Amino acid sequence: MPSPQQRSGSFRKVFVKLPSGKSTIHYERRKDNIARCGMCKKPLNGVKNNYTYKYSKTEKRPERVYGGYLCHKCLESLIKMTIRGIS
């Protein structure tokens, strides 16, 4: 029977064929989804999406206002709207 950590949904089952001909089940972490912009839903550049616990805080997302939440185009339009007073 699998150990309790392998019974969680965060691990996926991978069937692996061994050199002896038997097939066994290996458990591996599921891949995270790609980070997307909050306004236009396009994938964000410069944001790592897998194994984020291995990276430092500055490596995980860009160092700018709304970095990791908005893409550069949406941020540009948001800044323009706030300066012009449009809500």
From Swiss-Prot:
Gene3D superfamilies: 6.20.340.10. One of its GO terms (molecular function) is structural constituent of ribosome. GO terms for biological process: translation. One of its GO terms (cellular component) is ribonucleoprotein complex. Keywords: Ribonucleoprotein, Ribosomal protein. NCBIfam families: PRK04059.1. This is Large ribosomal subunit protein eL34. It comes from Sulfolobus acidocaldarius (strain ATCC 33909 / DSM 639 / JCM 8929 / NBRC 15157 / NCIMB 11770).
